[in-house]
Amino acid sequence: MKKSQLTVLILTLLLGSQLSAQVQDDADVRKFVGDMVAKHGFEESQLLSMFRQAKVSDTILEAISRPAEAKPWYQYRPIFIQDERIRLGREFLEQHRDILLDAEKQYGVPPEIITAIIGVETRYGKNAGSYKVIDALVTLGFKYPKRGKFFLSELEQFLLLTREQNMDPQTVKGSYAGAMGIPQFISSSYRNFAVDFDKDGRIDIWNNPADAIGSVANYFSEHGWLNGKDVVARAQVKGDGFKQLLDKKLEPELTLDQLSEYGVSAVTEHQPEMKAKLLSYQLEQGEELWLGFTNFYVITRYNHSAMYAMAVYQLADAIAGAKADEVVKLDE
């Protein structure tokens, strides 16, 4: 092959790879653009220009394929229940105590729960994400078939959000999954649940802890948080009947009275009519069993993972007082 031919081939391959990393000419993109124009009155030329700038990211596709929730509990738990994160949580709670108490008064959600959510999500705002949200949602919406429908819906919500809030969609940063700000709200959550908690005339969950705190509390309240009620209880079992209750469902469906028919009971005393879900967490050897009540289910509405919700609960418990090595030891 002549040098000139090789050069042309290399340039062609490079150009092809660049074009393949963009999506503006994709038929699905053009359908999406058409829908946004028809449904929401967007300008076609502006959307096409935006997509010309958007990039499909292999890094994002790799990141979403290996979430922390894929780890077993005994490996997942130490990521969040460790001294440094607990210390930072106590500092955050103390620094924003008045705002957190105001949020509790208005929404009924304890300060330590709000703090723990923010601690798990962004290490108290220290790691809110450096990905362009538009790139994340374009990548996952058009190039991740497993959850493409969901991320296309979030892309729609993101474009509506940036128009409503007068944001430049090219400058908004977030996680590899398109979650944004101190509390890591996805676009639909921002539009539905974010609040201007300090009443300064704008909602800013990136730089304003008050709005982040109020938004988390509002999210929990709107999803059914029960003020003053327990989140979980340790479970004890007799026989093997309990095993048929262990599945991937998260919502409590059986009362404690009904659970007792399967040999399941709470270690601590609770009202027999309370509904609970039996949960299993993998240890290095064996498992530990818990009962998740309505408030536990509410936490899973923030992230649909039983491990995530337990990490939030245990981090909140630690922030509220217990030391890291005292928070429900794995070998109990």
Predicted segment positions?
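C-terminal functional modules
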Residues: 276-332
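Bacterial N-terminal signal peptides that target proteins for export
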Residues: 1-7
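Flexible, glycine-rich surface segments
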Residues: 169, 173-284
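Solvent-exposed loop/turn segments at secondary-structure junctions
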Residues: 55, 121-125, 179, 238, ...
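Acidic/His-rich structured neighborhood in mature extracellular/periplasmic domains
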Residues: 78-215, 221
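Bacterial N-terminal signal peptides
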Residues: 8-17
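Acidic helix-start/capping segments at beta-turn-to-alpha-helix junctions
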Residues: 47-69, 118-122, 132-135, 234-242
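An acidic, Gly/Ser/Thr/Pro-rich helix-cap/linker signature
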Residues: 22-104
